[in-house]
UniProtKB/Swiss-Prot annotation:
Belongs to the SUA5 family. TsaC subfamily. Keywords: ATP-binding, Cytoplasm, Nucleotide-binding, Nucleotidyltransferase, Transferase, tRNA processing. It comes from Psychrobacter cryohalolentis (strain ATCC BAA-1226 / DSM 17306 / VKM B-2378 / K5). The keyword Lipid metabolism does not apply. GO terms for molecular function: ATP binding; double-stranded RNA binding; L-threonylcarbamoyladenylate synthase; tRNA binding. It is an enzyme of class 2 (transferase). Its main location: cytoplasm. This is Threonylcarbamoyl-AMP synthase. One of its GO terms (cellular component) is cytoplasm. InterPro entries: DHBP_synth_RibB-like_a/b_dom, Sua5-like_dom, TC-AMP_synthase, TC-AMP_synthase_SUA5. Pfam families: Sua5_yciO_yrdC.
Length: 214
């Protein structure tokens, strides 16, 4: 498929190829639709920041499929801090209406083999990471693993233009970023699926202090 033609697929392999080619992708998450890109592609991140009208200083959230991908990032935590983070990412039998996605600000070790780029961390010395619950996005993250992205990271921000509510469905996501609603050089693809129906908004916490940021 031409990169000038929007991708609409249920294949995580096609979606990962789209991301690796520097494109933006909308996809379902736990509670709302997200939009993201390859975090190690600066041009893609800058385009995403532009359509979201988001200052680079704020930093971006990245998601991955498993804590095992980010072992090096967890080494800066105490055993108690690490367990708190890991416990928040464990799937359980709680009803979706009571579930909440958890993102953690993790300190970046100086000896990290593949460092996290400044256009992802923004003005911070930490990176916002979530092990995502959504099975489809887990598959996508696994497809993103490479020498340059050993963490399987995908940028994750809410799928909406500035001032609009986050999309809750594929149709709503397309209404924001398909066709005339987005510039041709900012072509957005779509990974078809449904959210997990989480009713609580996602939470961001500082792994070192336990402070809830959002």
């Amino acid at each position: 498929m031409s990169l000038s033609t929007p991708l609409i697929t249920d294949s995580t392999i096609q979606a990962a190829t789209w991301l690796k080619n520097g494109q933006l992708l909308a996809y379902p998450t736990e509670s709302v639709w997200g939009i993201g890109c390859d975090p190690f592609n600066k041009q893609a991140v800058m385009r995403l920041l532009d359509i979201k009208q988001r200052p680079i200083e704020k930093g971006m959230i990245v998601v991955t499929d498993s804590p095992s991908r980010i072992t090096a990032l967890l080494e800066g935590l105490t055993a108690v801090e690490r367990q708190t983070v890991l416990d928040s990412w464990q799937a359980d039998s709680i009803n979706a209406t009571a579930k909440q996605a958890h993102t953690w600000l993790l300190p970046i070790p100086k000896n990290l083999p593949i460092t996290i780029p400044s256009w992802i961390t923004g003005a911070h010395d930490s990176v916002a990471v979530r092990v995502i619950d959504h099975p489809l996005v887990k598959q996508l993250c696994a497809q993103m693993v490479s020498v340059s992205n050993p963490y399987g990271f995908v940028v994750s921000t809410s799928c909406n233009p500035s001032g609009k509510p986050p999309a809750l469905s594929l149709i709503e996501a397309q209404s924001y970023f398909l066709g005339d609603n987005v510039n041709s050089d900012e072509c957005v693809g779509y990974l078809k699926g449904e959210t997990l129906g989480y009713q609580l908004p996602s939470q961001i916490g500082d792994a070192l202090t336990g402070q809830v940021i959002r």
